[in-house]
Amino acid sequence: MALPSDREIELTMDYGGFPRENRNVSIMQGGTEISSEYLCLENAGLSPRLINVLPGENGYPTTIEITLPASMSVIPFGASKAEVVAEQTDGTKTWRYDSNSAGGILYAGDYIRQDIQAGGMDIEFYYGRKHQAVMEAAGAAEAVKSVVDYCTAHYGMLSFGTGDTLKLIQSRVTGGGYAANGASLLDEADFTADNLSDTGKGGGAGEVMIHELVHQWWGLGNMFDASDESSLWSAEGLTVYTTYRIVKERYGPSYAQEHYVDQWQQAVDNYYLNFYVRNPDYLEALPEEERLEISNSLRYVRQYCEMPLKILKAEQLVGGEEAMDRILRGLFNRELDPMYPYLTYQDFLNACGLTEEDLNLA
């Protein structure tokens, strides 16, 4: 569609109805979705792209209105705030918000919102009503406060926050989530009862909740190259270590030693006694499906248990917790290489003044 040649125009685009999705696409998690209980519209899926139209000083000033069932709350991804401007007799509500871009991302669903003050920020925490019992049992709001207070004090502010506010949005997202412009996504799969009972991530549901939230710093705030599947260096090492430190601060050294360090050590001891670790040729001879299952289990131990032990040893070698905090704060706030923005194991070793051999656990 060609636009008028006037210097300034007001462009209104209306569309509605309930589009039909490919049956296979509709069951895939992540990406654009329109259903009776959840909505995700991204960029051109939300508003057609403007071509050959330069932005003004304030970008592309845009007002977006959307009418949805009254049970659904609208959450723009970013700093924009959506407000209800009309309620219809057919059980729908019209929401409106302003933006400075022609696209953007919009989420909507039957969300519960909790407002939390932590780390010098006002946090809007959104999660699905169907997860309410699980989230309350896990102490989700308390976990958010603990993590944000601790990580902000020890590592620094999240680069994708506005400084004053942050939206944490539970969503159907693939790849662990993403963050920008004062908002961050949390994968709803991380907050199921099954995941929250994973003892490899914490001593209970509340501690697993802490683990998943720490990924806002180690995983989103700082990214890790996951291309080498054999590497024990990943976002999990620093995330598990940070969870241990938070738990140690909350429940004391004895609890943290029993539920974290001792369990890491037991898992690592068992790893090096494992038949397939000692006889890798036998592992390679297995059928692919069985080989992958065993390899994934072994990699889990290395990333979630062995790496935290190495970080703990590094902590002792550099002079204790305060020294390690200074090192991690420096790494978290380092100047990134735009061509390779990942935090590497060598970066960590260099910051500690250590070598790989220094952190051998034998």
Model-derived regions, located:
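Juxtacatalytic substrate-recognition/specificity segment
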Residues: I64, D115-S231, T242
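Acidic/His/Gly-enriched intrinsically disordered linker/tail segments
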Residues: E236-L309, L317, L336-P338
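Active-site-adjacent structural elements in folded domains
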Residues: I169-S171, T199-G204, D225, P280-R299, ...
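Active-site rim elements
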Residues: P48-P55, H131-A138, A226-E229, I294-V301, ...
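Extracellular Ig-like/FN3 beta-sandwich strand-entry sites
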Residues: D6-E8
